[in-house]
Amino acid sequence: MKKIDMHAHFFPRIAQEEAARLDAATAPWLRIDEGGETGNIMLDNRAFRPVYRALWDPALRVEELDRHGVDLQVVCATPIMFGYRYDGHAVMDWVQRMNDLALEHCAYAPHRLKAMAQVPLQDLDLACAEASRAKATGHVGVQIGNHLGEKDLDDEQLVAFLRHCGNEHIPVLVHPWDMMTDGRMKKWMMPWLVAMPAETQLSILSLILSGAFERLPRSLKLCFAHGGGAFPYLLGRAENAWHCRDIVRADSPHPPSHYLERFYVDSAVFDPRALRLLVDTMGAERIMLGSDHPFPLGEQDIGQLVAQQPGLDDAARHRILAGNALEFFGL
């Protein structure tokens, strides 16, 4: 059965000198260890994350796709590459360079690899322009972070960007980033285990409860990473609150469940019980295979959770593994 992995990451061979042209202290770069098989994403001289060669080497990436039986993978930026903290004009060269490098990465095997672009989301005009440029140059969509500092996705600037993408038929993947990392989150990778799912829940509910979906075109193709974070499990809580509290429903004419048809989620939930809940909540027609490859917290055997899920008929399994992504990206 065909497999299309719509959520994977890359990081280009950015040297420290190139990153320093944007910001020596906070712009990320790649240090490759002796031997070339492993390395670290660096911030100045501080190691941010250990990584291995598939993140930057498309040849190894394709070898791994072959091993996992994946026909096509859509790669996007590692979120630390976004550059939202900088002035939009100052970061524009960086963003376009990253997007061009993503296309170079995919050019190794264009029938196996596609790219989603990043945009300078902090500047609406530049973000819209880069999204359109990226589509014209071969990207199949854009990936954005789930917030801009104190601005959630219901902020009018971000809604306007989503409206542009809907009108221009540019698919959007929303990925959590810049989550709470201090205080009680410092140990055991808690930011990735707790804060990331909470960020995605916050983003989805911000769009729903603000009424933003009422202002967005139905042509917008929107997907949330990591199975929608905590949202599927807590949908009942939000639904109950909408019915019971007027302050919850003040800006949303319909309960949260009404909007499930307006977005997709990926399948990166790692447990058959979680996937069963996800299918029951969203429907198989709203879930796409996503692995988070090649990071350690990604699905280690890409697509096997869906392929082996009890209770899925062949039609539903095909939709999740490939069919929905074909429609989402217009492939």
What are these regions (language model features)?
Residues 131-288:
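Catalytic pocket-lining loop regions of alpha/beta-barrel enzymes
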Residues 42-53, 62-86, 112-120, 140-144:
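Divalent metal-dependent hydrolysis catalytic cores, especially in the metallo-beta-lactamase
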Residues 121, 176-180, 293-295:
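Short glycine-enriched loops at secondary-structure junctions
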Residues 1-6, 13-72, 100-108, 129-133, ...:
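Mid-to-C-terminal alpha-helical segments outside catalytic/metal-binding sites
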Residues 11-15, 73-75, 81-85, 124-126, ...:
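Short catalytic/ligand-binding loop motif for oxyanion handling, primarily in non-cytosolic enzymes
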Residues 78-94, 125, 187-193:
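Surface-exposed, active-site-proximal loop segments in enzymatic domains
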Residues 88-95, 103-164:
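Long, hydrophobic, well-ordered secondary-structure blocks that form the structural core
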Residues 9-53, 179-198, 241-260:
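Active-site gating loops and adjacent loop-to-helix segments of metal-dependent hydrolytic enzymes
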